[in-house]
A protein has these predicted regions:
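A beta-strand edge to alpha-helix "cap/lid" segment located at domain peripheries
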Residues: 1-26, 30-131
Length: 131
């Protein structure tokens, strides 16, 4: 479990640095996400968005509400993410989000152990109202 939570922290750090290439290490070859713009994205799409700087954050904060290892090779993590946008691509369905705006999201991440290393397999996130 600690390995998965550390991986999640490293992914947040990479997102802050705009490190799309780092996501190559973190994402499963079969990665799929349902993102806040109600778009299904696969691994290469996500890496390209971060590598190009089309998605960028000036801050990312995560609060874990639930984390459990459901099988030897599966961990589920649920919680909230608060991000401050430093770039917003115009073709992602988030055109109304302003640079500098804070977004709150609920997320579910499913990690799978592949070839001895934990990788993010599935991500779902939904924008929630700012409290």
């Amino acid at each position: 479990m600690a390995e998965v939570l550390a991986l999640q922290d490293r992914m947040n750090d990479a997102a802050l640095r705009g490190g799309g290439a780092a996501f190559d290490e973190f994402l499963s070859k079969n990665f799929v996400a349902s993102d806040p713009s109600n778009t299904i994205r696969h691994r290469d799409d996500m890496i390209a968005l971060f590598s190009s700087g089309r998605i960028a954050y000036s801050s990312v904060k995560t609060a874990i509400d639930y984390a459990d290892q459901l099988a030897e090779d599966i961990v589920v993590v649920m919680g909230t993410e608060t991000t401050e946008q430093s770039a917003v691509p115009s073709d992602t369905g988030l055109e109304s989000v302003a640079i500098g705006e804070t977004l709150n999201r609920r997320f579910t991440n499913v990690y799978r152990k592949e070839d001895g290393a934990w990788r993010l397999l599935i991500k779902q996130s939904t924008i929630t109202p700012v409290k």
